[in-house]
């Protein structure tokens, strides 16, 4: 079962925490949709303004905490300085964009940038970097090898990368993967982070999956 199920949901409440902290009764679907819009707004802003930065670490995750009159958004990123333009205009513009999609104006919005010490130890950041390379028509084996080298700098215990689709423009789609170290998917106490990301290439969509084994509790 551990081989097929989503590693994050499998370990939720044990080694993984929720990404949203709030309670809603009748308004659950509305609040859930609002969280989705907030995350999409942040991702869109980053892709639009900072995608061309060669050393940008990307966004690892966005955590949303709600109170009666306060929405707190915490953005975990590899290089927060690249999100903060001159005099903090970058984060202020992002905050304004998020405020515009909120259904109620009487709630305060607090946005915080949290720096990740070793960004390439985060699967989402690594998967997006792989996608950028594949979309630039870099060979997939070379891309996977380079990604593993970057991840190993983050003091991880194991990593597995899988890419599926028309690799290198082949007529028949296939699946290729590479692994370094241990990735015990069936061990619940193992802290394994996971991400799926789709790369849009000229040959079609390539599915990228990244598993990173941090440590055991």
From Swiss-Prot:
UniProt keywords (A-Z) are: Chloroplast, Plastid, Ribonucleoprotein, Ribosomal protein, RNA-binding, rRNA-binding
- UniProt-listed GO biological process terms: translation
Per its UniProt entry, which superkingdom is the organism in?
Eukaryota
Matches recorded under InterPro entries:
KH_dom-like_a/b (IPR015946), KH_dom_type_2 (IPR004044), KH_sf_prok-type (IPR009019), Ribosomal_S3_C_sf (IPR036419), Ribosomal_uS3_bac-typ (IPR005704), Ribosomal_uS3_C (IPR001351), Ribosomal_uS3_CS (IPR018280)
Listed SUPFAM superfamilies: Prokaryotic type KH domain (KH-domain type II), Ribosomal protein S3 C-terminal domain
One GO cellular component assignment for this chain's record is: ribonucleoprotein complex
- Molecular function GO terms recorded: rRNA binding; structural constituent of ribosome
- Which compartment or compartments is the protein found in? Plastid, Chloroplast
KH type-2 domain segment(s): 46-117
Q: Which Pfam families did the record assign?
A: Ribosomal_S3_C
- Subunit description: Part of the 30S ribosomal subunit.
Give the protein family.
Answer: Belongs to the universal ribosomal protein uS3 family.
Q: What is this protein called?
A: Small ribosomal subunit protein uS3c
The species this protein was found in: Marchantia polymorpha (Common liverwort)
């Amino acid at each position: 079962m551990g081989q097929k199920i989503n590693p994050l949901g499998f370990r939720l409440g044990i080694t993984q925490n929720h990404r949203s902290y709030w309670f809603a009764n009748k308004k659950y679907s509305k609040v859930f949709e609002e969280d989705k819009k907030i995350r999409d707004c942040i991702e869109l802003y980053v892709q639009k303004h900072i995608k061309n930065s060669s050393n940008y670490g990307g966004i690892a995750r966005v955590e949303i905490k709600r109170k009666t009159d306060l929405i707190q958004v915490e953005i975990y990123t590899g290089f927060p300085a690249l999100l903060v333009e001159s005099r903090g205009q970058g984060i202020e513009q992002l905050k304004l964009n998020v405020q515009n999609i909120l259904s109620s104006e009487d709630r305060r919005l607090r946005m915080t940038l949290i720096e990740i010490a070793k960004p390439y130890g985060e699967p989402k950041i690594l998967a997006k970097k792989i996608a950028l390379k594949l979309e630039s028509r870099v060979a997939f084996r070379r891309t996977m090898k380079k990604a593993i080298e970057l991840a190993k700098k983050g003091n991880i215990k194991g990593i597995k990368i899988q890419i599926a689709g028309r690799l290198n423009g082949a007529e028949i789609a296939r699946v290729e993967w590479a692994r370094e170290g241990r990735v015990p998917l069936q061990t619940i106490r193992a802290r394994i982070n996971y991400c799926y990301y789709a790369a849009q290439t000229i040959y079609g969509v390539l599915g990228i999956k990244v598993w990173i084994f941090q440590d055991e509790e």
